[in-house]
UniProtKB/Swiss-Prot annotation:
Name of the protein: UPF0173 metal-dependent hydrolase Haur_4333
Domain of life per record: Bacteria
Record-linked SMART domains: Lactamase_B
A family per Pfam: Lactamase_B_2
InterPro entries, per database record: Metallo-B-lactamas (IPR001279), RibonucZ/Hydroxyglut_hydro (IPR036866), UPF0173 (IPR022877), UPF0173_UPF0282_UlaG_hydrolase (IPR050114)
UniProt organism field: Herpetosiphon aurantiacus (strain ATCC 23779 / DSM 785 / 114-95)
Keyword Ribonucleoprotein among record annotations: no
One function term, GO molecular function aspect: hydrolase activity
Family, per entry: Belongs to the UPF0173 family.
Keyword annotations: Hydrolase
């Protein structure tokens, strides 16, 4: 069996391929996503599970369409998944759980974690609340443990996630403005203690000005040797490097 493979689909979208060949997409957004590589569209023709961190359209943009096309289960916090079902996704596909809860799907364990952000979707002039924003701990059969922090600022619970799950890969936003930037992200990595870090949620729009070089500079200030895996949209990385 191959090891876990992680492909960045631009902005905050990721495709995970498990050692068993299962395909899991997180926060799918490709229509209107300026950083989504069109060559990756074929990668989403078949998926085995869909994970959602929160309700903002740059994270749920194509979740409904993809769920209806692939019949894959969709997992996330209860209120968000209730909205997914309300959009026409079959109830048998919908897995709404809550922070601290762990489920098994597509051959992995997925645990919802705390994130500090907001979560809503606009309906005309009204914003619909879609539950708390979250991150995920993803545990794969080859020993790869991914902590996807979700959209967030740095927070103290990250140290607990590091202690409990000992993730070896952290995926975290660095763009600033709507999430933490490089300075806070470096402190997040200090709390978590993972060997590898994959930056995301940067460069899509001018406001998201954080970049991997700035993250490296901040890590140097903290004397951390976390290895930054700076993927290009559409690029895959296999654990362990």
């Amino acid at each position: 069996m191959a090891n876990t493979t992680i492909t960045w689909l631009g902005h905050a979208s990721f495709l995970f391929v498990t050692p068993e060949g299962k395909r899991i997409v997180l926060d799918p957004w490709y229509e209107g996503n300026p950083s989504f590589p069109e060559s990756a569209k074929a990668e989403l023709e078949h998926v085995d599970a869909i994970l959602l961190t929160h309700g903002h359209m740059d994270h749920t943009g194509n979740a409904i369409t993809l769920a209806q096309q692939t019949k894959a289960p969709v997992a996330g916090i209860v209120e968000l998944i209730g909205w997914v079902q309300g959009q026409g996704v079959d109830a048998t596909q919908c897995i709404g759980f809550n922070k601290g809860g762990c489920i098994e799907l597509a051959g992995i364990k997925a645990t919802l974690t705390t994130a500090h952000h907001s979560s809503s979707i606009s309906s005309g002039s009204i914003s619909l609340y879609l539950g708390d924003p979250c991150g995920f701990i993803l545990e794969f059969s080859d020993g790869c443990v991914v902590y996807h922090t979700g959209d967030t600022c740095v927070h103290g619970d990250m140290a607990l996630m590091g202690e409990i799950y000992q993730p070896n890969v952290t995926i975290l936003p660095i763009g600033d403005f709507y999430t933490m930037g490089p300075r806070q992200a470096a402190h997040a990595l200090k709390l978590i203690g993972s060997k590898f870090a994959i930056p995301e949620h940067y460069g899509t729009f001018p406001a998201l000005h954080g970049n991997p070089e700035a993250l490296q500079s901040e890590l140097n200030k903290l004397q951390l040797n976390t290895a930054i895996v700076a993927l290009q949209p559409g690029e895959a990385w296999t654990y362990p490097a």
